[in-house]
């Protein structure tokens, strides 16, 4: 079973002015697609043949892990964004964020610090721990919270290819713009699962 590049859940220009169509063209059509192609080239003849992407992420290492995790991470990231995003969460998710961080503003500040402060290329995450509590995580490279038993709720891609066309080396400006696009409905579904 070959993995396929999932389509974006919106048009390439839908996230403008925060993320340009040009960025999505390179980020999705080239970078994300390359991980899919690489994974499909690495899987045949291995114990991972026929496994789900999530199973591969949880149990592989090396090149297979890096490409599988990057396919998973990017697909998740696209769904964390919406042209109708931004604002604040509501309901049980908002309550959990307030309980864990004191307020939405404090959460936003801490998530921003975590994402901006990720050394090199990586990902900033909001995760649900096994006990149901919320926490922030930063992963380097293709790192993914599934490997430590956490449930990803929200991610911000801080690999340079996510923002260099639009923001050059200004990662903080990109993360600031990210907040205008957060798909809280998707995050709430992850939290409820």
UniProtKB/Swiss-Prot annotation:
Catalytic activity field: 2 superoxide + 2 H(+) = H2O2 + O2
Cofactor: Fe cation
Swiss-Prot/TrEMBL induction comment: By growth in a high-phosphate succinate medium (at protein level). Strongly induced by growth on medium containing FeSO(4) (at protein level).
One protein family per Pfam: Sod_Fe_C
GO molecular function, one term: metal ion binding
Protein residues bound to Fe cation: 27, 74, 157, 161
Top class in the EC scheme: oxidoreductase
Cofactor descriptive note: Binds 1 Fe cation per subunit.
UniProt family annotation: Belongs to the iron/manganese superoxide dismutase family.
Biological function: Destroys superoxide anion radicals which are normally produced within the cells and which are toxic to biological systems. Partially complements double sodA-sodB deletions in E.coli.
Protein name: Superoxide dismutase [Fe]
Species, as recorded: Pseudomonas aeruginosa (strain ATCC 15692 / DSM 22644 / CIP 104116 / JCM 14847 / LMG 12228 / 1C / PRS 101 / PAO1)
